[in-house]
A protein has these predicted regions:
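Conserved small/polar residues in nucleotide/adenosyl-binding loops
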Residues: 281-284
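Glycine- and acidic
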Residues: 201-206, 210, 243, 273-278
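Alpha/beta enzyme core
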Residues: 187, 218-242, 248-277
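Structural preference for beta-strand elements that scaffold enzyme active sites
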Residues: 82, 114-116, 192-193, 241-243, ...
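Non-catalytic, usually N-terminal nucleic-acid engagement modules in DNA/RNA processing proteins
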Residues: 2-235
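Short, structured patches in soluble enzyme cores that scaffold and shape functional sites
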Residues: 194-198, 246-248, 279
Length: 284
């Protein structure tokens, strides 16, 4: 993650959408940069309610609120500063409400440190549509934007409102929207959560990448609105910071557009007096 160039010590990371303000502001504090002499350096500190993260950081994946084969103490001994959980898997099993009742993902897994959760978008689309089969079909020269599983019912379908998918566990049907993703992630209670986005492959057409990029931008707007509402509604819980996702596949101009769009969304949110925001990376 890049930081934007400025002479002062504080800096902002390139994927923030929103950070708490007001009564919750002190829980996150200021992201500070270490003195390195490099304006685009990645060394700094992210302050969260459950501790600091010194970047660059080793953050292992604990998909179902556990890092396989390791206890929390063993995780810490590896030098890990935070753990990343998965909204999709925890929603399916054991359920976001159970994690919420336990006090959030950190309490649920007995991890005394910062936590992240992703939005579930990658898993909904990669597991729901058989991502490996997508790539295999595309490399074989089939229609890149066509049906993923020809002759079979697709397990994931994207529309402008969200994604309808079938569970990889039992085939049951579910629906994720930006609002649902925010609701699940607020129940999971991670310090840093991510906006819902659409997964594409590097072999999708340029036209589809542009369409998906715009859909992801609109979903980020909806995520920010719902995140703001839930932050007020759940003021008794520790605050959470919302980060955006930069898409655009292999197209640099699309990735730059994603950064600019999300930066603008952050600034607009701040002007509206919402939860608060910090700006995206300035691209040159």
């Amino acid at each position: 993650m890049a930081v934007h160039q400025q002479p002062a010590t504080p800096f902002t990371l390139g994927t923030h959408l929103s950070e708490p303000t007001g009564a919750h502001a002190s829980a996150y504090g200021t992201i500070t940069r270490r003195t390195t002499g490099e304006p685009l350096g990645r060394t700094g500190t992210i302050h969260t309610p459950h501790g600091d993260i010194h970047t660059p950081a080793f953050i292992p994946v604990g998909t179902r609120a556990t890092v396989k084969t390791l206890t929390p103490e063993q995780i810490r001994s590896t030098g890990a500063q935070a753990v990343l959980g998965n909204a999709y898997h925890l929603y399916l099993q054991p359920g976001a409400d159970i994690v919420d009742e336990a006090g959030g993902i950190a309490e649920f897994m007995n991890w005394h440190g910062p936590t992240y959760t992703d939005s579930g978008g990658f898993q909904v689309l990669s597991l729901g549509s058989g991502f490996k089969k997508v790539l295999a079909a595309e490399f074989a020269g089939t229609d890149r934007d066509g049906e993923v599983r020809r002759g079979k019912e697709r397990m994931a379908n994207v529309d402008d409102e969200g994604v309808t998918f079938r569970s990889h566990l039992d085939g049951s049907r579910h629906r994720f929207t930006p609002e649902v993703s925010m609701q699940i992630q607020h129940q999971l209670g991670a310090d840093i959560i991510f906006a819902f986005d659409e997964l594409t492959t590097l072999l999708n057409s340029r036209g589809y990448q542009e369409e998906a990029l715009e859909r992801t931008r609109l979903w980020a707007e909806r995520c920010l609105v719902e995140h703001s509402r839930l932050t007020v509604e759940r003021a008794h819980r520790p605050p959470q910071a919302l980060w955006g996702v930069i898409q655009g596949a292999q197209y640099e101009d699309l990735r730059r557009k994603a950064c600019r769009d999300l930066q603008q969304l952050s600034l607009e949110s701040e002007e509206r007096g919402g939860v608060g925001s910090v700006s995206y990376t300035h691209l040159r």
